[in-house]
Amino acid sequence: MAWGHRATVCLVLLGVGLGLVIVVLAAVLSPRQASCGPGAFTRAAVAADSKICSDIGRAILQQRGSPVDAAIAALVCTGVVNPQSMGLGGGVVFTIYNASTGKVEIINARETVPASYDQGLLNQCKNVLPLGTGAQWIGVPGELRGYAEAHRRHGRLPWAQLFQPTIALLREGFRVPFILSQFLNNSILRPHLSASTLRQLFFNGTETLRSQDPFPWPALANTLETVAKEGAEVLYTGRLGRMLVEDIAKQGSLLTVQDLAAFQPEVVEPLEMPLGNYTLYSPPPPAGGAILSFILNVLKGFNFSAETVARPGGEVNMYHHLVETLKFAVGQRWRLWDPSSHPGIQNISRDLLREDLAQRIRQQIDGRGDHHQLSHYNLTGVRGNRMGTSHVSVLGEDGSAVAATSTINTPFGAMVYSPRTGILLNNELLDLCWRHMPTSPITPPPVPGERPPSSMVPSILVNKGQGSKLVIGGAGGELIISAVAQTIMNKLWLGFDLTEAIASPILHVNSKGHVEYEPKFNQEVQKGLQDRGQIQSQSQRPVFLNAVQAVFQEGPCVYAASDLRKAGKASGY
């Protein structure tokens, strides 16, 4: 009996001891989980604009893939889940940070002007905006060669492995996602879709597909399988390219197999700008990094913080300075011409990062928003209202990071479909419509091989001293730069958590210098800005389509957030 009692006591003590060991080990092996707070990850994360694509990117990382591998896999997925935004018929810009070397590079695979194009193209701009449907607007797709170049330089897993999750998604009974159904049934888009070759993909008889309807897309599944097995060249110099060109020629396209074969992505150095304790790395023209850098460079001189904004009138004062800075920024968009086709632009765009220019702009900002004519800001008054695009942010276990923005331009691009390849074509040449130099009444014609200007700003901010990193970018056409700039301000200057920084309603300044407010934007701030002479746009856009995806690393903690405006959800571990 005594022996049995002693044995029981020993077993209890052994159990308690083992429990303590487990607790201690858990505390030693995973101290970060407790200190980082709920919702944080401790190793890596992916933020795409849908949960399923974020999960696919995370799975690639867990299979020991590189951040570039994860970004490619998530982008391939997004081309299926949100085909209105991006796909193989579009273009992509990567900003890539290598933690082992500390180097950042840009891979620009944005679409180019084909060798032959409609010579009267730019004369059509006023009549086709904002959508720009039709084969005459198609640029040479660069998406897939962009993936191939990024994978060649930074990939770790086999190429085919990056496509398998999305192929399985298509083969196993894919259904229409909610966000796609919203676009398909949009009152503006629906008539154009019905009249286009996309009708065969997105309509069931006379009705558009609804959320959770079966969505068979065998042509794209076949294309992805072929690309997975044979590589990107099958689209650029092989049979898929020939099929694509033949399909869209029937719809008026002038794109040729020679255009596809000639396309090459560019690998260039990023724009680099100090921002407090961070360094901002962003893509140079024709992408929009120079404009984003200009905005933040001007605003950082006003030293806005949570404390200054909390003072009476502080929030209105910050947004007033933001609005005035955005007016100047919109007036500088002409600097985003492609420097490869217009060499004189390169230095002009880099001037936007100069501190003396930022200081001069600050001195021109006073307490009123109605003291100056449009010419003071170089504003043209030409309204754009462009929208579209998708973004993925990735942080790997070693601290390497990728920000990748991809697009077919406006929703559903040119609304031109290749039924044999399953590819939707871009309408990227529409972006040439706002290539205007305020000092000249003449806009030079497009140059074959030229990349149109873009608002895409896949960016990485690095604070090496504190081990912090913000990987960020967005979608929403002309709203991208406004949304990304305000998210960075919210996070780094005002101390918002990442989800709140992204979710906060934004404002935007159009080319008339008028302010557009996202629904639910603070009414008191709106009133305060009006009292300062800021003019609210009378033609409010029907919907704000801005969507930011970001990953933030702070020491051992990793936070990731995808924009709920597009029903996004990040994933990590």
From Swiss-Prot:
Family from the record: Belongs to the gamma-glutamyltransferase family.
Residues listed as glycosylation sites in the UniProt record: N98, N185, N204, N277, N303, N347, N378
UniProt feature coiled coil, ranges: none
UniProt pathway annotation: Lipid metabolism; leukotriene D4 biosynthesis; Sulfur metabolism; glutathione metabolism
A cellular component term, taken from the record's GO annotations: plasma membrane
Keyword Acetylation belongs to the record: no
Residues spanning the membrane: 9-29
Organism: Mus musculus (Mouse)
One Pfam family this sequence matches: G_glu_transpept
Superkingdom to which the source organism belongs: Eukaryota
Residue ranges that the UniProt entry lists as topological domain Extracellular: 30-573
Binding site for L-glutamate: R110, T407, E428, S454, S455
The protein's name: Glutathione hydrolase 5 proenzyme
Activity regulation details: Inhibited by serine-borate.
Subcellular location: Membrane
GO biological processes: amino acid metabolic process; fatty acid metabolic process; glutathione biosynthetic process; glutathione catabolic process; inflammatory response; leukotriene D4 biosynthetic process; proteolysis
Catalyzed reaction equations: glutathione + H2O = L-cysteinylglycine + L-glutamate; an S-substituted glutathione + H2O = an S-substituted L-cysteinylglycine + L-glutamate; leukotriene C4 + H2O = leukotriene D4 + L-glutamate; S-[(2E,6E,10E)-geranylgeranyl]-L-glutathione + H2O = S-[(2E,6E,10E)-geranylgeranyl]-L-cysteinylglycine + L-glutamate
Processing and modification events after translation: Cleaved by autocatalysis into a large and a small subunit.
Topology versus the membrane: Single-pass type II membrane protein
Disruption phenotype: Deficient mice shown no obvious phenotype but in most organs they have only 10% of the wild-type levels of gamma-glutamyl leukotrienase activity. Mice deficient in GGT5 have significantly more airway hyper-reactivity in a model of experimental asthma.
Molecular function, one GO term: peptidyltransferase activity
Lineage: Eukaryota, Metazoa, Chordata, Craniata, Vertebrata
InterPro entries the UniProt entry points to: GGT_CS, GGT_lsub_C, GGT_peptidase, GGT_ssub, Ntn_hydrolases_N
Tissues and organs where the protein is expressed, per its UniProt entry: Very low level of expression. Detected in spleen lymphocytes, medullary and paracortical thymic lymphocytes, lung interstitial cells, bronchial epithelium, proximal tubules in kidney, crypt cells in small intestine, neurons in brain stem and cerebral cortex and in Purkinje cells.
Note: A previous study reported that GSH and oxidized glutathione (GSSG) are not substrates for murine GGT5. However, this result contrasts with two studies reported that GSH is indeed a substrate for GGT5.
Entry keywords, A to Z: Acyltransferase, Glutathione biosynthesis, Glycoprotein, Hydrolase, Leukotriene biosynthesis, Membrane, Protease, Signal-anchor, Transferase, Transmembrane, Transmembrane helix, Zymogen
